[in-house]
């Protein structure tokens, strides 16, 4: 996955693609 989610927050990962 390219996104990391925790406690209702989702962020795109810096090293993706």
From Swiss-Prot:
Site (Key residue important for binding to potassium channels): 3
Disulphide linkage map: 2-16, 5-10
UniProt-recorded Gene Ontology molecular function terms: potassium channel regulator activity; toxin activity
Major place of residence: secreted
GO cellular component labels: extracellular region; nematocyst
Name under which the protein is recorded: Potassium channel toxin AbeTx1
Recorded consequence of changing residue 1 to A: 3-fold decrease in potency of inhibition of Kv1.1/KCNA1 and 30-fold decrease in potency of inhibition of Kv1.6/KCNA6
Additional facts recorded: Negative results: does not show effect on rNav1.2/SCN2A, rNav1.4/SCN4A and B.germanica Nav1 (BgNav1), rKv1.4/KCNA4, rKv1.5/KCNA4, rKv2.1/KCNB1, hKv3.1/KCNC1, rKv4.2/KCND2, rKv4.3/KCND2, and hKv11.1/ERG1/HERG (3 uM toxin tested).
Family classification: Belongs to the sea anemone type 6 potassium channel toxin family.
Record key words, sorted: Disulfide bond, Ion channel impairing toxin, Nematocyst, Potassium channel impairing toxin, Secreted, Toxin, Voltage-gated potassium channel impairing toxin
Biological role: Potassium channel inhibitor that is the most potent on Kv1.1/KCNA1 (IC(50)=671.95 nM), Kv1.2/KCNA2 (IC(50)=167.36 nM), and Kv1.6/KCNA6 (IC(50)=115.68 nM), and less potent on Kv1.3/KCNA3 (20% inhibition at 3 uM) and on shaker IR (15% inhibition at 3 uM). It inhibits potassium currents, not only by blocking the potassium current of Kv1.2/KCNA2, but by altering the energetics of activation of Kv1.1/KCNA1 and Kv1.6/KCNA6.
Organism name: Actinia bermudensis (Maroon anemone)
Source taxon at top rank: Eukaryota
Keyword Ribosomal protein included in the entry's annotation: no
Result after altering residue 7 to A: 26-fold decrease in potency of inhibition of Kv1.1/KCNA1 and 7-fold decrease in potency of inhibition of Kv1.6/KCNA6
């Amino acid at each position: 996955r390219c996104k990391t989610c925790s406690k209702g927050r989702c962020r795109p990962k810096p090293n993706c693609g």
